[in-house]
Each structure stands twice: as C-alpha cells, then as structure tokens.
Amino acid sequence: MATHAKPELWRTEVGDAVAVLNIPGALQRRRTFDIDVSLVVRVPAENEEAWHELTLEVDGRRQWSRRIQSNCPGQTDGLDYHCRSVLEAGPAMRIRAVAGTHGSVVQRLLIEAREEA
C-alpha cells in the first residue's frame, strides 16, 4: 500500500528588503507549489511621495515586479503576489523576493510555498 506524504509547506519571513526561500529537490516526484509573497511597509505620516515595490524571482529569473505609491500615511501599506510553480523531480527551487522603497520602510517581507495536495 502506497503512503501519501503530507503536503510540504516552506516559509520565510524577514524584516529586511531581501527574502530567500530554498526548496530542496525531491528525486522521486514532481511537485506543484502555490507561492505567496507579501510585503508590508510602514508609511510615514508626513511623506506624500513615498512608494514601495516588490520583485519576485524564481531560480534567478524575474517572474513579477510592481511599484506603487504608498498610501495610508502614518500606517502600513503593502503588496501581495501569488503564482503557481511546478518543480520537476530532481532539482531544487530558489525563490527570492526583493523590496524597494522610497520614503516608506520595510516592516515585513514574507514568502510562503504550499505544495498542492
């Protein structure tokens, strides 16, 4: 009787501008991951020209990038991105999120990869 492995969950959270998540390869099976990236920035009350941006790279290739004006002066604002990636049997996957800011300050940068069951 075959046993089914529990779906994998990989996660990293930093309070800095760069987060890296390495998912090791699996020799016996192909896996599909739902990848969520979340950036939260603190927006100063007095800065009307603040902006923040988020770039996602998978295995060194840019998958997505966006820059927006930071709203909610004196509070937090953010950017979120979701994608799905297939990891063939064998190789590992490296996910890198890079935040950029002007006026606002990175509070949290999170990458989460959940294996599809």
Predicted regions and their residues:
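Solvent-exposed, conformationally flexible loop/turn segments
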Residues: 12-19, 30, 73-78, 90
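Intrinsically disordered, low-complexity segments enriched in small/polar residues
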Residues: 13-14, 23, 58, 72, ...
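Terminal beta-strand-rich extracellular "head" domains
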Residues: 40-83
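Beta-strand-rich interaction surfaces with strong enrichment in secreted/lumenal proteins
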Residues: 7-12, 22-25, 67-70, 81-85
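C-terminal interaction-tip segments
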Residues: 1-18, 24-26, 37, 101-117
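Noncatalytic modules at the cell exterior or secretory-pathway interfaces
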Residues: 30-37, 84-107
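Short, surface-exposed binding/anchoring microloops in extracellular/periplasmic proteins
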Residues: 25-49
